[in-house]
A protein has these predicted regions:
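A beta-strand edge to alpha-helix "cap/lid" segment located at domain peripheries
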Residues: 57-126
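Short acidic-aromatic low-complexity motifs
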Residues: 1-32
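Short, mixed-charge, low-aromatic patches
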Residues: 6-16, 41-42, 59-63, 115
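A solvent-exposed, acidic/Ser-Thr-rich amphipathic alpha-helical stretch
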Residues: 26-82
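Hydrophobic pocket/interface hotspot
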Residues: 13, 29, 37, 52, ...
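Short histidine/acidic/glycine/proline-rich micro-motifs that form metal-
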Residues: 15-19, 43-46, 92
Length: 126
């Protein structure tokens, strides 16, 4: 994956969390993930489009639409051998201190879609 492809992947991924339209959000999930892809963290282990769509909807409704936060890159994004490392932060859309910092590790299939996503989230220290 070259830098332009990596930037496009991350842009679509972040856009998915911000997307208010449920049909468009589902389309982004299906574009980004394998049909049996998984999203894992210490709090959940979900698999498949329906579960991932529900997870993204919950996060969007709570953090983006509900509390006015946005997600954005927070550090260097890197990729090799089908693995992507992406640091992100959640901040108020109108400015203010960071609410959360995360590291997402993506394992991609040969077609570039997500096979597995491992999420690590650090809560705010504010």
């Amino acid at each position: 994956m070259d830098q332009q492809q990596l930037d496009g992947f991350i842009s679509r991924y972040i856009g998915m969390w911000h997307e208010p339209d449920e049909a468009r959000r589902r389309a982004l999930v299906q574009e980004l993930w394998a049909a049996d892809g998984e999203n894992r963290s210490r709090r959940f282990d979900i698999r498949g489009y329906d579960a991932i769509v529900a997870r993204v909807k919950h996060a969007h409704d709570e953090w983006v639409a509900g509390k006015g936060f946005v997600f954005r890159p927070a550090g260097n994004t890197d990729a090799f051998d089908g693995v992507v490392k992406f640091f992100w932060e959640m901040v108020p859309k109108d400015g203010g201190p960071r609410e959360a910092l995360g590291l997402d590790l993506f394992v991609l299939q040969e077609d570039g879609r997500i096979r597995s996503l491992y999420q690590f989230v650090e809560p705010s220290t504010n």
